[in-house]
Swiss-Prot record:
Gene: purT
Protein name, entry field: Formate-dependent phosphoribosylglycinamide formyltransferase
GO cellular component: cytosol
EC top class named in words: ligase
Binding partners and assembly: Homodimer.
Family listed: Belongs to the PurK/PurT family.
Function: Involved in the de novo purine biosynthesis. Catalyzes the transfer of formate to 5-phospho-ribosyl-glycinamide (GAR), producing 5-phospho-ribosyl-N-formylglycinamide (FGAR). Formate is provided by PurU via hydrolysis of 10-formyl-tetrahydrofolate.
Species for this entry: Psychromonas ingrahamii (strain DSM 17664 / CCUG 51855 / 37)
EC number: 6.3.1.21
Pathway: Purine metabolism; IMP biosynthesis via de novo pathway; N(2)-formyl-N(1)-(5-phospho-D-ribosyl)glycinamide from N(1)-(5-phospho-D-ribosyl)glycinamide (formate route): step 1/1
GO molecular function, one term: phosphoribosylglycinamide formyltransferase 2 activity
Residue numbers binding ATP: R116, K157, S162, S163, G164, K165, G166, Q167, E197, G198, F199, V200, E205
Length: 396
């Protein structure tokens, strides 16, 4: 479904977008939608989620409750349904799409990428794309058998999780029990199916933001990132890589987004070893490592996603040179989070920016914001971003 006439928010003819998931990435998407006068409805499983704070209205609902989701969607009648998390009742989205609702980029893309199994089988088994070796397991017995076949070291992940939750590396027999237990408590849907991946020696990881739009497929410059406990801590753009490796990554990305279909931005993750490229994962939405694009490009990943969704051309994406993001990571227990020393943080690096996500609470580790900075080199940009993020004090 395409929209050619755009109404104004809250008017009788308003063009509406419903966000399914309202975290920090959804918040930036909501802001970009509002730049075009779109009425934004934000939904998530908890109150006062970041995107709800900048939306016109909101709903608190489990994304896995298909019946309640369908009730909200039929009542709101959005022009665009925009999934912003993996764990959604995708069968409901498929049914609603068949009724004529517009799921971004497609309901099939949401279903295939809601867990690691659908997209891994599509990439490796249907499209013949190079990935790490893998086996899926439903029980501890299957898990142990899979490790015998895959070998050590290997990576254990719930099929449905994000930000490193439930993920660990098995290096020896001493890690087996803890890795299994963690995989069963860390996933978005609790106990269940996991993937055991053979460890791929790599030089670096990249995110290749890929935009499928009315004027074709477009690529942002590759983004490098550092992970800790399966979650990103810093990202930078551009990541240096060989012409051969970049072309391989772009070819794979185009193959996958073409298969998934629809308009929008896709966060493609790859491992790179020399000129060899291994597909890892894809999300049909903005990627957390892409927060760096808030300063590194003329149009951020969020702006690109919205422009593609609305059916607008992308044209040329302009990259401004070495830029980096550094996570402001909280670790505590509070439902009244406060920040200090922001003046010192912003004053420590010329041109630096801070985004605080305004998450309503914290219990353990949680990403609460990000610092973004430029530099003469990527290394300097990363150092600058870390300098800023490290100066932010969090009060729990």
């Amino acid at each position: 479904m395409s929209v050619s006439i755009f109404g104004s928010a809250k008017a009788n003819s308003a063009t509406k977008a419903l966000l399914l998931g309202s975290g920090e990435l959804g918040k930036e998407v909501a802001i970009e939608l509002q730049r075009f006068g779109i009425e934004v409805i934000a939904a998530d499983s908890y109150e006062n989620a970041p995107a709800m704070q900048v939306a016109h209205s909101s709903h608190v609902v489990s994304m896995l409750d298909g019946e309640k989701l369908a009730t909200i969607i039929r009542a709101e009648k959005p022009d665009f349904i925009i999934p912003e998390v993996e764990a959604i009742a995708t069968d409901t989205l498929l049914a609603l799409e068949a009724e004529g609702f517009n799921v971004v980029p497609t309901a099939r893309a949401a279903k295939l990428t809601m867990d690691r199994e659908g997209i891994r089988r599509l990439a490796a088994e249907t499209l013949g794309i190079k990935t790490s070796p893998y086996i899926f397991a439903d029980s501890k017995e299957e898990y142990l058998s899979a490790i015998e076949k895959i070998g050590k070291p290997c990576v254990i992940k719930p099929v449905m999780s994000s930000s490193g939750k439930g993920q660990s590396i098995v290096k020896s027999a001493a890690d087996l029990d803890n890795a299994w237990t963690y995989s069963q408590v860390g996933g978005r849907s609790g106990e269940g199916r996991i993937i055991i991946e053979g460890f791929v020696p790599f030089d670096y990881e990249i995110t290749l933001l890929t935009v499928n739009a009315v004027d074709g497929t477009h690529f942002c410059d590759p983004i490098g990132h550092r992970q800790e406990n399966g979650d990103y801590r810093e990202s930078w753009q551009p990541q240096a890589m060989s012409t051969v490796a970049l072309q391989k990554a772009q070819n794979i990305a185009k193959k996958i987004v073409t298969e998934l279909g629809g308009y929008g931005l896709f966060g493609m993750e790859f491992f790179v070893k020399g000129d060899q490229v291994y597909f890892s994962e894809v999300s049909p939405r903005p990627h957390d490592t892409g927060l760096v694009t808030l300063v590194s490009q003329d149009a951020s990943e969020f702006a690109l996603h919205v422009r593609a969704i609305l059916g607008f051309p992308i044209g040329r994406i302009i990259q401004y040179g070495p830029c980096a993001s550094s996570v402001i990571l909280g670790n505590g227990l509070s439902d009244d989070i406060k920040f200090t020393n922001l003046d010192q943080a912003l004053g420590s690096v010329a041109g630096a920016q801070i985004r605080l996500f305004a998450k309503p609470d914290i219990n353990g580790q949680r990403r609460l914001g990000v610092a973004i900075a430029r530099g003469e080199t990527v290394e300097e940009a990363v150092d600058n971003a870390k300098t800023v993020s490290n100066k932010v004090n969090i009060i729990y």
